[in-house]
Every structure is written in structure tokens, then in C-alpha cells.
Design a protein with these regions (language model features):
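Enzymes that bind and transform nitrogen-containing heteroaromatic metabolites
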Residues: 1-295
Length: 295
């Protein structure tokens, strides 16, 4: 039987298939726990992330096809990972759940440019549950919305982007001195401020971590793209990965550079980042894998 995107199951609970046992000594500081009933109906069980004491914890949320494509090539897509996930409702719910838990959402400029109307809040991807997410954040003593950090070395951003103009959503653009000069010429909204942290053409991962720490952020969510994810992996700053595996094969050829899960970073022999599988969930034909990286 042929399976098409239109025939995929949507809105199903993220059924738990396997959970790793709790470590003998559970971390003292954690974020999350039992979910509100409206969220638990879609994600049975608890959602807990261990927090570092000495630095912000960073978790990543990414999507990949069966053959490892995380995003289509520039010009092929205007929705980021939407075409890869098949616009899965379950994937959008997982995105909302992690945003609801986070102090900060970090996105790379490339991811910003392909989603002009996107706003990095739980309510944007799950509007029917907006009040539930707001109440959940209030119960955890979190700000009404996570602060969004856009990483752009060049400062080449569209000031009319919906995510840069959403009421009540603070945005910081982490950039270089050259990028800051360009941004100073743009009509950015009052909720956007610029942090000059990079040098040359690069925003170092360590400097980005300092921006998160200065905000008082304990938990940051990286939503890519693959270049930013690779930078954070290379700096050994990614603590967990929530990976949606979409049940499609996209393919690659010489006509366009479709992005893998990690771009711009390669690890030498014996230097790759290994992770331990901590949970497996499914919704329809989608798999939701959670990995914890070793220290």
C-alpha cells in the first residue's frame, strides 16, 4: 500500500514505546514533570529535563527524513523543516511542548529566512492550546514567552519578519560588529535588541552561551538549522537531542544542496559525539527519539 503525506495519521498521542531507566542518582535541579491534562492527552507521562548548575542546559529539536535530510535546499523550501516532517501535527506539538519548557529559543539566521511568518512560541504552532501553555509556564514560574535569540553573523535579516515583531516576544540578535552595523540601519521593532558577541564573520558558540547565561536562562532550546546545531555540538554544549524521524525518503543530487542534520562541522576519527538513547515515542508513522549526550 502506498503511503502519502495526505494519508498520514495526524494528532495522535505520542505513544511511549521505550523509556530508559532513571539513573541511580537523579539530578537535583530539573525542569518539568507531570504535564497539564490537555498536554498529557497528547504526550502521556512526564517530560523532565535535567538542568546544569554551572551553565545553561541546551536541548535541540530537529527533524530528519529517513535518509538524513533535515532541510531542503535554498529556493526549494519556504517553511524550514515543514516539508521534511510532512507538516506533521505531532511534530508541531512536540515543538510547542519544548518551547513551553524553555527560557530561551535559539535559531540560526538560515532557519529564520525560510520561515517569514513563523513566531517561535508554543502558541504559534498550537494556537488551540495557547492558554494551556501560558498556564503551564506560569506554574513553572517562567516568563510568559521564551526569549528568542537569532544568531546572524552578517545581520542580514528582514525586519518585517513576523518573529521579530510578535507582541510580547523579546528577541535578541547575536551578531558580529559588522552585523551590528547593518542591523543599526534596519527599522527593528522595540522588542528587538542587538548583542555584539562575535568577531569577523563568526558568532562563537561560547559567546552565545554567555548571552543565554546573562539572560538568566537555565534551559535553552536550539531549533537549528543544521549549521548552528553543528556549532553547538562541536563546542560540546548540546545536552539532549529530540529528533523527529519523518517516514519519507527525500534524496539528494548535484542540482541542489539539501542539508543534513549537521552542516559545516565534521569530527575527526574517534572524535564524533556519541549519545545515549533515553526514549522512543511514535505518533502514526513518525518516530520521536530522545538522546542524551555524554559530558
Amino acid at each position: 500500500m502506498e503511503v502519502t503525506m495526505a494519508g498520514r495519521s495526524e494528532g495522535l498521542p505520542l505513544e511511549s514505546l521505550w523509556e530508559a531507566p532513571e539513573p541511580p542518582t537523579a539530578p537535583v535541579d530539573r525542569r518539568g514533570g507531570p504535564l497539564p491534562p490537555a498536554l498529557a492527552a497528547r504526550y502521556p507521562g512526564e517530560l523532565i529535563v535535567a538542568l546544569h548548575e554551572e551553565r545553561p542546559t541546551i536541548v535541540a529539536n530537529m527533524v530528519s527524513s529517513l535518509d538524513g535530510v533535515a532541510a531542503l535546499a535554498p529556493g526549494e523550501s519556504n517553511t524550514g523543516g515543514g516539508e521534511i516532517s510532512g507538516f506533521s501535527e505531532a511534530d508541531r506539538f512536540m515543538m510547542a511542548l519544548l518551547r513551553g519548557l524553555a527560557d530561551v529559543v535559539v535559531v540560526g539566521a538560515g532557519a529564520v529566512r525560510v520561515g517569514h511568518r513563523h513566531v517561535w512560541t508554543a502558541a504559534h504552532v498550537q494556537p488551540a492550546l495557547a492558554d494551556t501553555f501560558a498556564a503551564w509556564r506560569a506554574e513553572m514560574w517562567l516568563a510568559p514567552q521564551p526569549t528568542v535569540i537569532v544568531v546572524s553573523a552578517s545581520g542580514n535579516l528582514d525586519p518585517t519578519h513576523a518573529g521579530l515583531n510578535a507582541p510580547g516576544v523579546p528577541v535578541i540578535v547575536a551578531t558580529t560588529p559588522t552585523g551590528a552595523e547593518r542591523l543599526a540601519q534596519l527599522p527593528l521593532g522595540p522588542n528587538v535588541r542587538v548583542a555584539t558577541v562575535g568577531t569577523g564573520k563568526h558568532v562563537p558558540a561560547g559567546a552565545l552561551l554567555e548571552v543565554i547565561h546573562a539572560l538568566g536562562g537555565r534551559l535553552a532550546l536550539c531549533e537549528g538549522g543544521p549549521h548552528l546545531f553543528g556549532e553547538l555540538l562541536r563546542a560540546r554544549l548540546v545536552d539532549e537531542l529530540f529528533l523527529t524521524v519523518a517516514p519519507q525518503v527525500v534524496g539528494r543530487d548535484d542540482t541542489a544542496h539539501r542539508l543534513g542534520l549537521v552542516e559545516g562541522t565534521s569530527f575527526g576519527e574517534g572524535q564524533g559525539r556519541w549519545a545515549g538513547l533515553s526514549s522512543v515515542r511514535r505518533a502514526g508513522d513518525d518516530l520521536f527519539l530522545r538522546y542524551r549526550f555524554a559530558e
